[in-house]
Regions:
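Surface-exposed, glycine- and small/polar-enriched segments that build interaction surfaces at terminal
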Residues: 17-310
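Bacterial Sec-dependent N-terminal signal peptides
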Residues: 1-19
Length: 310
């Protein structure tokens, strides 16, 4: 009987050369299903989230849905496209497009486009485009563009473009541009274009195009094109093009004007130094001894730069 079955199968395949094996049919149907299946989208159903706590709400937390209106004590959502208001805070797994307000904190895993207001902190895992106001700290993982105001510190992992106002600190991991005010310090890891004003310290990791102003010290590791004004010192690690005003001004190369008690350049000066002591590696220090009616002996020093003494 088994032999007859095998023989019948062989004859059927010979008379039907277009027939295919069952596994071939299954693979073909799977390919056809893949072609017919619509591409996956992250934009799922839209709903209203009235929430007391995570998973105690009118909208369950998933990975595809989005929320158009959120009101609660503490809320957890996938995506917010609209308005969210919470007494304590909210956690959004992906992006926010709209307005978020919370008594304590707003946390967004993706990008924020719109306005955030929180009593303590706003945290965005990716980018921020818009306005962020927090009582203590505003944190953006990558780019921040817009207006950021925090009572303590604003921190951007990458580029910061716009107006950043921090009670103590503004920190940008890469470059920054715009207007930065801080009660203590402005720190930019890359280039800075614009105005940086700090109560104590302003530090730029690469080049400055604009103005630095601080009560204590301005430091630019690369070139400076613009103006530096400080109560104690201005330091430029490359070429200073423009104006330096401070108790001490130092640059590798100076092209412009240095005004201070002590002015120094290392390699080249194309400009003018106005100060009590103007120095460079070629400056000659000459000691002077002299006497008078009031004092029998006086000792002084003068610094000679080419044809000028200070």
């Amino acid at each position: 009987l088994v032999s007859l079955l095998f023989a019948g199968t062989a004859l059927a395949q010979e008379h039907n050369p277009g027939s295919v094996q069952p596994d071939t049919i299954q693979k073909s149907s799977e390919k056809s299903f893949r072609k017919q299946r619509s591409p996956r989208t992250d934009h799922g159903p839209v709903g209203i989230n009235i929430s007391l706590w995570k998973n105690i709400s009118t909208q369950r937390t998933d990975t595809i849905g989005s929320t158009c209106f959120n009101l609660g004590v503490f809320s957890s959502m996938n995506r917010l496209n609209g308005l969210g208001m919470n007494i304590l805070g909210s956690v959004t797994g992906r992006d926010v497009n709209g307005v978020q307000m919370a008594g304590l904190s707003n946390m967004v895993g993706g990008s924020m486009r719109g306005m955030q207001i929180a009593g303590i902190t706003n945290i965005n895992g990716n980018n921020l485009i818009g306005v962020s106001v927090s009582g203590l700290v505003g944190i953006t993982g990558n780019h921040a563009q817009g207006v950021i105001i925090s009572g303590l510190a604003n921190i951007s992992g990458d580029y910061n473009r716009g107006a950043s106002i921090g009670g103590l600190l503004n920190i940008s991991g890469e470059g920054a541009s715009g207007i930065h005010f801080a009660g203590l310090a402005n720190i930019s890891g890359g280039n800075f274009k614009g105005f940086s004003g700090a109560g104590l310290l302003s530090v730029i990791g690469e080049d400055l195009n604009g103005m630095q102003m601080s009560a204590l010290t301005n430091i630019t590791a690369g070139d400076m094109t613009g103006v530096q004004v400080s109560g104690l010192g201005n330091v430029v690690g490359g070429t200073a093009r423009g104006l330096q005003i401070g108790a001490a001004n130092m640059a590798i190369r100076a092209k412009g004007l240095q005004i201070g008690l002590f002015n120094y350049y290392k390699e080249k000066l194309d400009g003018f130094q106005l100060g009590l002591v103007n120095a460079n590696p070629q400056t000659k220090v000459q000691l002077m001894f002299f006497g008078g009616n009031a004092t029998k002996l006086n000792v002084g020093a003068r610094f000679k730069n080419r044809l000028f003494y200070t």
